[in-house]
């Protein structure tokens, strides 16, 4: 397991939030200089590899794993296709957690679901069901997510008070994720949609 491969794995897991240089160095137990050196190697590797669609975007001392610009039209085509519009069970479960626990970070959602949820979050953001509600104070400045006005309209809610009792929700979370409200209403508006098991975008 090389240092470069460890960096690649971390960048993949943190998703669109990216990660700061100091936090990455801390996780790797390396100096910031050494970490940046290895990051640069990975960035140059992606840039020179015509068979890779990946790229590392550097903003200040923050790094995000992205796709290369030349794939933008292809990804836009996918985003607009009917196949991409259906929300998976994983996305609906993620949405229910955000609705009840907002504002909440991706890491907190991951801990509740027990799996990595960046794909579901990206899908929900693209569908305008959730949005950024601020940042966590501290290292990394993780994004906090919450539901949108479109979410309220989409599920026929006038306010979050119309959701089932939060204490009951927290009790149920210990056994099974409560997504029935969202699943039923989503199925009503998307009768041809199919949900799949596991984490899907």
UniProtKB/Swiss-Prot annotation:
Entry keywords, A to Z: Cell cycle, Cell division, Chromosome partition, Cytoplasm
Cellular compartment(s): Cytoplasm
Family matches, as InterPro entries: ScpB_csome_segregation, WH-like_DNA-bd_sf, WH_DNA-bd_sf
Coiled coil: none
Single GO biological process annotation from the record: cell division
Signal peptide: none
Pfam families the record matches: SMC_ScpB
SUPFAM superfamilies: Winged helix' DNA-binding domain
GO CC list: cytoplasm
The keyword Cell cycle is assigned to this record: yes
Function: Participates in chromosomal partition during cell division. May act via the formation of a condensin-like complex containing Smc and ScpA that pull DNA away from mid-cell into both cell halves.
Family per similarity comment: Belongs to the ScpB family.
PANTHER family for this protein: SEGREGATION AND CONDENSATION PROTEIN B (PTHR34298:SF2)
Subunit and interaction comment: Homodimer. Homodimerization may be required to stabilize the binding of ScpA to the Smc head domains. Component of a cohesin-like complex composed of ScpA, ScpB and the Smc homodimer, in which ScpA and ScpB bind to the head domain of Smc. The presence of the three proteins is required for the association of the complex with DNA.
UniProt protein name: Segregation and condensation protein B
Organism from which the protein derives: Enterococcus faecalis (strain ATCC 700802 / V583)
Taxonomic placement: Bacteria, Bacillati, Bacillota, Bacilli, Lactobacillales
């Amino acid at each position: 397991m090389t240092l470069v491969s460890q960096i690649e794995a971390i960048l993949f897991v943190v998703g669109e939030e990216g990660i700061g240089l100091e936090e990455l160095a801390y996780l790797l137990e390396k100096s910031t200089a050494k970490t940046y050196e290895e990051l640069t190697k990975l960035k140059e590797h992606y840039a020179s590899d015509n068979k890779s669609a990946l790229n590392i975007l550097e903003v200040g001392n923050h790094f995000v794993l992205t796709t290369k610009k030349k794939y933008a039209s292809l990804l836009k085509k996918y985003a607009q296709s009917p196949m991409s519009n259906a929300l998976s069970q994983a996305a609906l479960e993620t949405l229910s957690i955000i609705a009840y626990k907002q504002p909440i970070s991706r890491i907190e959602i991951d801990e509740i679901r027990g799996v990595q949820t960046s794909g579901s979050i990206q899908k929900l953001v693209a569908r305008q069901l959730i949005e950024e509600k601020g940042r966590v104070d501290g290292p990394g400045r993780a994004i906090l997510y919450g539901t949108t006005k479109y979410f309220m309209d989409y599920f026929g809610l006038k306010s979050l008070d119309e959701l089932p009792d939060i204490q009951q929700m927290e009790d149920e979370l210990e056994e099974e994720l409560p997504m029935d409200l969202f699943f039923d209403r989503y199925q009503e508006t998307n009768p041809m949609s199919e949900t799949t098991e596991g984490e899907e975008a």
